[in-house]
């Protein structure tokens, strides 16, 4: 079955890439974003990376649900793929087992972090908007986004829901790289341009100031268009946001800084993501989103 999955995944990725490229899917948005931030994004390479990761999600996702729980078992090889944990990440992952806030982005194979973290014994909870029809949503929640019989997908919408998740000692996951178009969005900068920031992390830290904040991502070492998938090493990175940058009771009582200075997303997460994008802009899939629409809508009408 693993061999068949490899063949089907490779075939699907090629077909999906060809179809989307021919249709020019999101091409104008990608180019508008790239021009706005003066970033050398290769539309074809980005699309090839995106379809490859989508095919792995559809046909190879089960591999991540087989990964070992013990940190000492890494590096390991499962279903022909090699997995490892980055140097210095184990203590952070151990702390994540006690819960907190987990920030990540549409970067690389970001969906695969869900089952991997769950297999490591981390009580991950990720909020997703339910999809329709209901039977498809049930498949997503109970089959795809479930590990060892536990779904890590929840439909949390209110502040009370989010605080309850933290109170239960869960690790709350939030994709924090999208344009926030709600009235409470915070002003900030991203890739040198004005951009709205998701206010949720800062809201949670205001009410639970001792909550640790983590950032995780998967690095594919040896990844290149000519590198076989089986020869890549998938490395899990985990870092903790510096406590000095997180809202504390003392800081909350002091004169209020500007929104961009006080935002943990703007001051820490965006800087981390900018570094990842500089390393490889063709792995940040939010180039296909209108990330700067709230601040600069005109760039998407040219």
Set out the residue ranges of the language-model regions.
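Catalytic core of membrane glycerolipid acyltransferases/transacylases, capturing the structured
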Residues: 96-156, 182-184, 189, 227-228
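Membrane-anchoring hydrophobic helices of lipid-metabolizing enzymes
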Residues: 1-104, 139-141
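Active-site metal-coordination segments of metallo-dependent hydrolases
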Residues: 27-29, 132-134, 194-198
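Short Gly/charged-rich anion-binding patches and loops
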Residues: 29, 112, 139, 199-203, ...
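Generic structural signal for isolated residues within well-ordered alpha-helices
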Residues: 18, 33, 116, 142-143, ...
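A conditional alpha-helix N-cap/helix-loop micro-motif detector
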Residues: 79-86, 107, 133, 152-156, ...
């Amino acid at each position: 079955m693993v061999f068949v999955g490899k063949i089907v995944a490779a075939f699907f990725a090629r077909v999906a890439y060809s179809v989307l490229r021919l249709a020019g899917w999101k091409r104008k948005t990608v180019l508008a974003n790239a021009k706005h931030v003066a970033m050398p994004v290769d539309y074809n390479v980005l699309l090839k990376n995106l379809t490859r990761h989508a095919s792995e999600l559809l046909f190879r996702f089960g591999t991540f649900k087989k990964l070992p729980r013990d940190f000492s078992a890494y590096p390991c090889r499962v279903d022909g793929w090699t997995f490892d944990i980055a140097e210095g990440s184990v203590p952070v992952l151990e702390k994540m087992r006690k819960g907190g806030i987990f920030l990540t982005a549409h970067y690389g194979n970001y969906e695969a972090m869900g089952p991997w973290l769950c297999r490591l014994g981390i009580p991950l909870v990720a909020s997703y908007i339910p999809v329709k029809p209901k039977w498809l949503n049930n498949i997503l929640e109970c089959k795809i986004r479930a590990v060892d019989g536990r779904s890590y997908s929840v439909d949390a919408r209110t502040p009370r829901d989010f605080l309850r998740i933290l109170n239960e000692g869960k690790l709350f996951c939030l994709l924090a790289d999208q344009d926030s178009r709600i009235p409470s969005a915070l002003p900030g900068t991203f890739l040198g341009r004005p951009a709205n920031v998701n206010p949720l992390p800062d809201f949670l830290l205001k009410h639970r100031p001792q909550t640790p904040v983590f950032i995780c991502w998967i690095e594919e070492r040896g990844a290149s268009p000519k590198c076989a998938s089986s020869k890549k090493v998938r490395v899990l990175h985990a870092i903790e946001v510096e406590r000095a940058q997180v809202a504390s009771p003392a800081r909350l009582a002091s004169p209020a800084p500007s929104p961009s200075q006080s935002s943990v997303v703007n001051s820490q997460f965006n800087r981390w993501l900018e570094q990842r994008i500089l390393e490889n802009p063709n792995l940040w899939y939010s180039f296909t989103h209108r990330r700067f629409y709230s601040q600069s809508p005109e760039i998407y009408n040219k």
